[in-house]
Amino acid sequence: MARKIKKGDTVKVLSGKDKGKTGEVVTVIPKEDKVVVRGVNIVKRHQRPNAQMRQGGIIEKEAPIYVCKVALVCPSCGQATRVGFRFLDDGRKVRYCKKCGEVIDK
């Protein structure tokens, strides 16, 4: 199944503690239907000292958020929108904005 949200997309959070925030998708986790968005859903984790991190402590990192809780921000109209698929004349399947109709994948 084709993914409506991909790595590098700008998304807006629709619900939860970070409602209204926008950020870039860092990672997509298809098996869990989750995405990691930069600057959104920050959680604190207790880190033990190890080879990479000499000093342990409490670190802040982004946690995954469900795909249904975010909406893609259209690059042309700048609004949070649903995504559809259509085939171009050359046979490519591309994503498009359902609000303005512009193709998202170039």
Curated annotation (Swiss-Prot):
InterPro entries: KOW, Rib_uL2_dom2, Ribosomal_uL24, Ribosomal_uL24_CS, Ribosomal_uL24_KOW, Translation_prot_SH3-like_sf. One of its GO terms (cellular component) is ribonucleoprotein complex. GO terms for molecular function: rRNA binding; structural constituent of ribosome. Gene3D superfamilies: 2.30.30.30. Keywords: Ribonucleoprotein, Ribosomal protein, RNA-binding, rRNA-binding. Signal peptide: none annotated. CDD domains: KOW_RPL26. The keyword Ribosomal protein applies. It comes from the Bacteria. GO terms for biological process: translation. One of two assembly initiator proteins, it binds directly to the 5'-end of the 23S rRNA, where it nucleates assembly of the 50S subunit. One of the proteins that surrounds the polypeptide exit tunnel on the outside of the subunit. Part of the 50S ribosomal subunit. Belongs to the universal ribosomal protein uL24 family. This is Large ribosomal subunit protein uL24. The gene is rplX.
